[in-house]
C-alpha cells in the first residue's frame, strides 16, 4: 500500500474542515459588519487558500518520489510532517495566534522544507 493511500483521507478531511470554516465564518458572522468579522473571514479564506496552494503540489511530489523508489517510511514521515506543518500554520498560526506568530512561521517554513526535500529527491534520482 502506498503512503498516499493512507494520507489522502487526512488531507481531504483537513481541507474540508478549512472549507467549512470559511462557510461558517461567512454565514455565522454575517449579522455583524465589524473589522473583527472581516478579519475572521479573511483569516479563514487565507488558511483555506494557503492549503490549496501548497498541499496538492507537495502531495504530487511525494507520490512521485515514492513511485521512483523513495522508502515508504520516508514518505510517511514527510506526509506526517506536512500535515503537522499545515496545522501549525493554519490553526495555531492564523486562527489562534495574531497571524504572524511562531506557529505560522514554523508551518510555512516546514511546508517548504517538505516540498523542497521531495523535489530534491526527485532531482537526484535521475
Where does each model-flagged region fall?
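Interfacial segments of alpha-helical transmembrane regions
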Residues: 1-13, 75-79
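Transmembrane alpha-helical segments that form the membrane-embedded catalytic/substrate-channel core
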Residues: 11-28, 83-93
